[in-house]
Amino acid sequence: IAIYLKDYLSDKELKTVNKYIKKMHKKFIKPEEFLEKEKGFYAMGNGGIPNLAYAHWTNNKKLAAKEFNFRFKNIEEVFYDDGYINNNSFRGFRALWYHSYGLNSALGYIYLAKNWGAKVPELVMNRITKAAEVLNLGITDYESFSSRKYDGKQKNNQYKKHNARKHTHQEALAIDT
């Protein structure tokens, strides 16, 4: 929200906010800003959106470019050619929810990339588009969606019938319409 107020801050206020933002970046974002995440795609563009917020505040186009390149590579790794998402799409009865969660986060990230003028790689767009098709499959034919087996190891999944609730992520507004 501070970015919307930046032009209206006095020099003293701007100095205070800058100091605060730099400290917060150093303490909370910097330690994890480019961690390799091999499984899934989750909140805040899988951790990339805080980098973009900081890059925007500091007008650091190099940081933004590095972030986009890093996160696009991450999307290429965890979004499969067939539209399923590593880890997200294979969480038992929670798979549809986690699939929509990852897809929604990636869609938001791509929207930000386009607003920055970044070129989104064709492979990323193809995999995101396919993931949207898989989400629609999960909504219309859950059995077909869940028939794809995961070739990795799962630690956090639910396969007990009483836990079944086929739904999309509550913050992925209108993703299922």
Stretch-by-stretch model annotation:
Residues 1-117, 125:
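Aromatic-lined, polymer-binding surfaces characteristic
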Residues 120-177:
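CBM-like carbohydrate-recognition segments
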